[in-house]
Amino acid sequence: HGLLNISADDFFDIDTTMPEDKVEQEKIGRLLKKLDTLITLHQRKYDKLVNIKKSMLDKMFPKNGASVPEIRFKGFTDLWEQRKLGEVFEEYSEKNHAELPPLTIIQGGGTIRRDESERALQYDKSSLSNYKMVNKDDFIVHLRSFEGGLEKASSQGIISPAYHTFHGEDADSRFYYAYFRSKKFINKDLKPHVYGIRDGRSIDIEGMKTIRIPWASYPEQKSIGDFLTHLDTLITLHQREHIKPILEVKRVK
């Protein structure tokens, strides 16, 4: 009762609605128990998929200066390289595209159109010509990238001029998205290029471009990107088709 911030007497005086028939009470209790068991079962499967992805990510990128990853798809034997981020990805800044939809960056969720956002975001529509264009699957360095890594555009649109946009000609965005959001990249590679304190922190973009990142042949990047996309789809489907519906049923009951 301490968590509720009310006295024990007041807590036990709360009126509750329940059937008078004990048989009905027991049936409802059994149903809720079954729902809890199902939720636990599917949550375990969901957690297992998430852990599989985490483990595979750890093994599909070379560690500690190694030139090959621990796990590879059949048919790939070339050594991986370490290249500067600025060599793999080119920064671009293209403005005067007010005809494109303004986008909002979602931490860990790509981008959405501002007019589709649940939050009523205010912005000066007269300044849209100063916004930067970003193409689908290109990377965005946004205001909180020092915490969650780089974000990837889900569609073409325009973003705040405070952001930086990058395109990789021979880079599979799904492959690098996983890397750019990894703890290793954020805490070890990116952190030395973050300056300022608290809410004033920013990324030194020129310094970030010097970070050495793994580079594999485009076909191998694509194979890894395909695999990670498949895993993400399984994880999302399991949550949407199994866990959420059961939680909704329990809430209604």
Which ranges hold each PLM region?
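Feature detects amphipathic, helix-rich regulatory segments
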Residues: H1-K253
